[in-house]
């Protein structure tokens, strides 16, 4: 993700590769850190600096390294039927011109070393909130052995949804998703 074009990298690891998780949200903090501006970045800015990985690409030695990557994606579903597998939903090509109040489902995903899990939840597009008790579908893909570097078919590891075969893993990853994305319950 980050390449220093100078012939000898000041960080000591020219061309090094890391297995650390990185998200787009980390880019701003990383660039600010590399520019020496990290102390100027407000605490309200999300993300973590990936600059320490340039010094030591071994993410297991970095206490701030992420254990997972998270994402969310709205889908514009036409005539979705509850309890059908995700692959038989009729999905529109693009949400670009879809009115906000027509977005009925939000997919929340977590990617760990061994798994990618997505939960498709009913979405209240007016309140901008997912209904965490209304799970429409789940997807779980085993990425054991996927180092992210081996050239393979685009979706070699995402051909078989194994969610029904791994209920304990689904519960664990769902709890992590909810902890990351779900808002705290309102206090009275």
Annotate the PLM regions.
Residues 23, 71-163:
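C-terminal, low-complexity/hydrophilic appendages and adjacent surface loops
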Residues 22-29, 33, 44-52, 104, ...:
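A structural signal for well-ordered alpha-helical segments within the folded catalytic domains
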Residues 69-70, 169, 184:
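Intrinsic low-complexity/disordered segments
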Residues 46-47, 73-75, 121, 184-188:
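Short, solvent-exposed turn/loop segments enriched in Gly/Ser/Thr/Pro and often Arg
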Residues 1-44, 48-63, 80, 147-150, ...:
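Substrate-binding rim/cap in mid-to-C-terminal beta-strand-loop elements of soluble/periplasmic
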Residues 63-66, 177-188:
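Bilobed periplasmic-binding protein-like "clamshell/Venus-flytrap" ligand-binding domains
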């Amino acid at each position: 993700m980050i390449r220093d074009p100078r012939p000898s990298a000041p960080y000591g690891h020219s061309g090094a590769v890391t297995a650390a998780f990185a998200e787009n949200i980390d880019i701003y903090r990383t660039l600010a850190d590399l520019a020496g501006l990290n102390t100027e970045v407000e605490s309200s800015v999300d993300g973590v600096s990936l600059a320490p990985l340039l010094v030591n690409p071994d993410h297991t030695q970095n206490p701030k390294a992420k254990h997972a990557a998270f994402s969310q994606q709205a889908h514009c579903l036409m005539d979705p039927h509850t309890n059908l597998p995700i692959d038989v939903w009729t999905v529109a090509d693009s949400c670009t011109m879809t009115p906000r109040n027509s977005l009925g489902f939000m997919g929340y995903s977590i990617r760990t070393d061994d798994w990618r899990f997505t939960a498709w939840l009913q979405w209240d597009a007016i309140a901008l909130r997912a209904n965490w008790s209304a799970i429409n579908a789940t997807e779980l893909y085993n990425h054991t052995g996927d180092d992210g570097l081996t050239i393979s078919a685009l979706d070699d590891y995402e051909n078989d949804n194994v969610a029904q075969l791994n209920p304990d893993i689904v519960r664990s990853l769902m709890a992590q998703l909810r902890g990351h994305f779900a808002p705290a319950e309102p206090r009275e």
